[in-house]
Amino acid sequence: SNIELDGCMFRWKYPLWYSKHIALNNTTWFENARAGVWYTDDIKVSDCLIEAPKNFRRCNGLMLENVSFANAAETLWNCNNVEIDKVLAKGDYFAMNCKDMRIDGLTLYGNYCFDGAENVTISNSKLLSKDAFWNSRNITVRNSFISGEYLGWNAEDLTLIDCTIESLQGLCYIEHLTLKNCKLINTTLAFEYSSVNADITGSVDSVLNPSQGRITADSIGELTIEPDKVDPSKTTIICRDNCGGKGSKGCA
């Protein structure tokens, strides 16, 4: 405990386990330094390069600032009270089952991020990720770009504000989905079985069977609401220009 590390290089596994009150600066984890920090509390990592996967698990009180993950596969699992500022990460299953996260300036290349995460705020970020935010709760994303199919399935309380989203069959099976001033580009079969309150800038390619709520957009290329699957009276669709497709009752 109470360790400060500056300009260090880790080349082998498990360098910091079961530690407390750690500060690292200008430090490098090489490829074989896998599973570098587990079961550690109160740790700040600044201006570091991390080449090894499976880092940062079951940590509490973690701050990552200006950190680059060349291989972030299965990184940041089951951590609580996490702050991320200006982080670049490449790898699948980033931040699974984390709680109480505050993120600003994350650039992520990797699928299945934030699966099962809770109480997360994300700002000014770019996520290129399939299956992002699955099974998550209480997520708010602001001023960010998200691209990847099946966004947000089985989530609860997902809020997107001032975001640009590209997602095949995205935003489905969600309880309490909110979109404010968002753009949906190349997004088809959206909102299936979701309870949604969406204010969309521009058009949506297609919407399929939202369960309830209100969707406002400039236009919807194809709107499908099937009365044998959902109750059309529970969803209000407002198109500023044009709604198209079948079952589009309730357009105004």
Task: Identify the meaning behind each predicted range.
Residues 1-252:
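Long, distal/terminal scaffolding or interaction modules
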